[in-house]
Amino acid sequence: MADSLKMAGLSLEDSQHAPSHATGRAPYIPPHLRGQQRAGPTMPVDGAAPQGRPPMNPGSWGPNGAPPNNWAPRGANNINGAPAWGAAGGGGARFDPNAYGHPGHRGGQSHGGAGSGAARGSGDGQWRDGKHIPGPPNARLERELFGVPNDPSKQHTGINFANYDDIPVEASGHDVPEPVTTFTNPPLDDHLISNIKLATYKTPTPVQKYSIPIVMGGRDLMACAQTGSGKTGGFLFPILSQAFKNGPSAVPTQNANQFSYGRQRKAYPTSLILAPTRELVSQIYDEARKFAYRSWVRPCVVYGGADIGSQLRQIERGCDLLVATPGRLVDLIERGRISLCNIKYLVLDEADRMLDMGFEPQIRRIVEGEDMPPVNGRQTLMFSATFPRDIQMLARDFLKDYVFLSVGRVGSTSENITQKVEYVEDADKRSVLLDILHTHGTGLTLIFVETKRMADSLSEFLINQNFPATAIHGDRTQRERERALEYFRNGRCPILVATAVAARGLDIPNVTHVVNYDLPTDIDDYVHRIGRTGRAGNTGLSTAFFNRGNRGVVRDLIELLKEAHQEVPAFLENIAREGSGYGGRGGGRGGGRGRGANATRDMRRMGGGGPPMSGTPSYSGGYGGGANNYGGSYSSAPSYGGYGGGYGGGSYGNPSGPTGPSSWW
């Protein structure tokens, strides 16, 4: 074989990459070092064949390929948050597996190999020596988060915000803080105010005017505000502002030694936001990224229907503010990847919809069955467009000494929305819809149907009629739904056909027209559907197709139209007088889940009898046993009486509580 190689001009004794030595053999050069040897000394060899793994570059590695003693991990890189190894240079922080990814152990550390490098967080800010140090501006990220002027995919302040000063606001509870009128310090942090300015928000909405001082003052809150009124900012602004001022929390010592494969295995968020749908949690997460820009706070989002591996990797890089759907959060808790022991803020957004969708067992497990601090050890905020009586009664288990906030005619509809109701038989709906689209062809149009099959069928029909349309419903994959929403937002497909999955909470900017192709069977769903337009102070148009198949909601619909000062068609009045239309879900106005005139009222002040009140009076006849005595222990279910007349007039006592039977309402 050697002879044949020599015939070809090759030799087993020759090397094409290094000079020959006296022994006649050339040293082995690892592929990653070839071409670099001329710049440094030749690696010594003893003439014997290399044994074991080849030696590494002596200028970079210590004995046996191990890092030398002066090496320390640099801070998280900008790609995936993993440690980047490099020379410490005498000033770098030593690697501490107990601190990696734990925000509570970052104080006083320099997030870099030699006192430099980017810090962990959504905006590359730092918390160092008890101070919040914002990161440098990032033009590309700013364009991604905040858009550019006149960006159609971003919602900006509406033209009717000036009229919000005339909207009535009801705040019940003792010692309600005075509302704020501008985004200033105090009470907000300067860095948050700078991000609010980047978002071109100039004036707080009514819910924000009250929620900011309430949450900053340490109170629990139940907020009932009109759809599109800025509820997301109502809880994000005070939570992030407190985080920027107070810094991260330390991880409990019993959990500080959890470290696996160079990463923190379990996340310890300080804020938890629960919402019912994938679209809503994604929307809240996007807003959190926006207002946490250049800060030390790192938001994360988890939801079902998406790759759990990528979500786990996101959490492992650090998670200070977690936005989640209840089901996926329970899954991650069971996997041991998330602990709730550090939670300071719990937010339930669209709380009534979460219960409607059957999430109550998961919510109770998250709040009461895991390691989340008890009601007195955290702040709890509930936000939604409606809070029927049973939801308010549920609040007794989750909230303490809370302020009930009702802004405007919530549970009704916004006057910013012009509502039209047309009598259309089922067979004529498609032709009438085409007429409407030809008449109101500009802007984004959102069409609601009742079934997934109808969503696909109607979108295909519109495409065949040369209308650019797309559809979204529960059977579509998460990627298909996200793509459809993106095409709709940027105007590529200005017509979106949707089932109820997109009706609640989605903040789709600049929707000018909502069409209820199929009316829902519950009036609350109608309220939330048409609330997709007329958001953030802008005006909008709503058209509903009505026929006798919808007579179950006729009385509720008439009342809503009157409350919003809209025209009531004569055919609605006629059908209502026929006597067959009284009800809706639950068999009548105020039936079902308790909607009606009291759906936006503080149930602590509603009448109803029950045992006499007890405890020290604090507001309108007694709050019921003092601020800290309502509710009971988490070890047994509370026994409760009627909710009585007056604030604290009824009894929601729990014999297992600290002072015996105490009054709830």
From Swiss-Prot:
Q: Which SMART domains match?
A: DEXDc (SM00487), HELICc (SM00490)
- Could you tell me where the Low complexity compositional bias lies? 58-86, 653-665
Which parts of the sequence form the motif DEAD box? 349-352
For the ligand (ATP), the binding residues are A225, Q226, T227, G228, S229, G230, K231, T232
Give the EC number(s) listed in the UniProt record. Answer: 3.6.4.13
Give me the reactions it catalyses.
ATP + H2O = ADP + phosphate + H(+)
Q: Which cysteines are joined by disulfide bonds?
A: none
- Where is the motif Q motif annotated in this sequence? 181-209
Pfam families reported for this sequence: DEAD (PF00270), Helicase_C (PF00271)
SUPFAM superfamilies referenced in this protein's UniProt entry, alphabetically: P-loop containing nucleoside triphosphate hydrolases (SSF52540)
Q: Where in the cell is it found?
A: Cytoplasm
Question: Gene Ontology terms, cellular component aspect?
Answer: cytoplasm
UniProt entry keywords in alphabetical sequence: ATP-binding, Cytoplasm, Helicase, Hydrolase, Initiation factor, Nucleotide-binding, Protein biosynthesis, RNA-binding
Task: Tell me the InterPro entries matching this sequence.
Answer: DEAD/DEAH_box_helicase_dom, Ded1/Dbp1_DEADc, Helicase_ATP-bd, Helicase_C-like, P-loop_NTPase, RNA-helicase_DEAD-box_CS, RNA_helicase_DEAD_Q_motif
Q: Where is this region: Disordered?
A: 1-144, 579-617, 645-665
Q: Where is the composition biased (Gly residues)?
A: 106-124, 580-595
Question: Helicase ATP-binding domain location, by residue?
Answer: 212-405
Q: Which GO terms describe its molecular function?
A: ATP binding; ATP hydrolysis activity; RNA binding; RNA helicase activity; translation initiation factor activity
Task: Cite the Helicase C-terminal domain residue spans from the record.
Answer: 416-576
Q: What is known of its domains?
A: The Q motif is unique to and characteristic of the DEAD box family of RNA helicases and controls ATP binding and hydrolysis.
Task: Describe the task this protein carries out.
Answer: ATP-binding RNA helicase involved in translation initiation. Remodels RNA in response to ADP and ATP concentrations by facilitating disruption, but also formation of RNA duplexes.
Q: Which PANTHER family match?
A: ATP-DEPENDENT RNA HELICASE DBP3
The family line of this record is: Belongs to the DEAD box helicase family. DDX3/DED1 subfamily.
Q: What is this protein called?
A: ATP-dependent RNA helicase DED1
Q: What is the lineage of its organism?
A: Eukaryota, Fungi, Dikarya, Ascomycota, Pezizomycotina
